Amino acid sequence: MKLFPVKTTLAAALLAATAAATAAPTWITIGDKAHALVAKVAPNARTLASRQVPVNVPVSRGSAALRASSEGVHVVEIDDGMLPTLSLAIHRNQRKCGGFLKHETMAEALAVLHRVDGAPEQELAPSYAIDNQTIVNALLPQLQASNILSTITQLSNFQNRRYNSTHGVAASDWLFNQWKALNPGNRRDVQVRQITHTWAQKSVEFSIIGSGNSTETVILGAHLDSIASGGVETARAPGADDDASGVAGLTEVIRAMMAGNYVPKRNIRFIAYAAEEVGLWGSQAIVNQQPGRRDKVVGVMQLDMTAFQGDSTDIWIYTDFTNAAQNQFVANLVGAYLPGYSVGYDACGYGCSDHASWHNKGFIASFPFEASDATYNFQLHTPNDTIATFGGTANHALKFTKLALAWMVELASDGTPAQAQAAPAATSKTASR
């Protein structure tokens, strides 16, 4: 996610990266603030096109009332070897990760620029009726903060989970095996797989095939990797909050659904993305692997940092580069299933987590977050992003796990509460690719 600003010169890093940079061009879309660093990091980069993108932002931090605003988004041609240095500059100067997305071709980047407001096709919008209380209320009590904390602990015990380190590879393999173990009855409608990319770390996916409308899919995501300054292998980056907390939330929702023999009507996919911290590479690659499947995704939610309560508000919903109708649905779910929890609203800028990869291609996406943009966990991307930073409990993360379960069941059950029947048992489909 984001990074607390530190007063560190980038001269040495820039010099080394410049020397190592290749001449191979690549194309990125990048927000205004991050774009201001491009000339310093890569003087030979070229801005090819720019656009002011309309966004909705709160009239004041926390307010549900929104006002129309805009953010500049730019298409930049840059040497591929300079992207890690650009990432580092954004981390250190603007207390955030992401801020840009890498694209395979110039044409793809330009196409994203011209639809980055993410306006969905009308026929993709699902019903946002809250009408699956029987299923949701049966599953919510199964969610346990202790289970979430256990997963966070195990993930943060890796030296780091960097996308190109042996530790990052091992973390992906560990999660793959953990998710496989959540299907002990070998349900044949369940598939667990690793998704291979052009870098070392694999994304991990747990999916359940819908029993009825299996041409439509609901996606809950988090990112698996972590990052901190230092060597690829030696840097200590526990990433307990960023984003072991989100992955742990996904894991607990899967566990509860499997224990409750939940069978969705729509397909559901849980995805732990690789390489979020260096520009949303994993989610971008997965979105790009879906030609012909675009009209099947009816909703996306991202859990990225859920464990640190930075202020008195329980759940923050970020309104820029997300879908307003689904955001309202998320807020309505809090009122329906999490009574007493408060909701605030804020904005985080272009490309601040993996939901942006989906939003940029026109999919409906939302991003609930642990705190406001001013009060979140500033220890991320450091060796201090540990369980101790958020008090040694997963009580705050449990709120988001409950919200994610309610969201997924309400969308995946397609308004039919009777879908929580016993699941079919047979050999599961388990693959690695």
Language-model-derived ranges and their functions:
Residues 200-203, 234-325, 329:
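Acidic/histidine-rich catalytic neighborhood of metal-dependent amide-processing enzymes
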Residues 108-165:
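N-terminal hydrophobic or amphipathic helices/low-complexity stretches enriched
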Residues 25-26, 35-37, 51, 55, ...:
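Fungal extracellular Ser/Thr-rich, low-complexity intrinsically disordered regions
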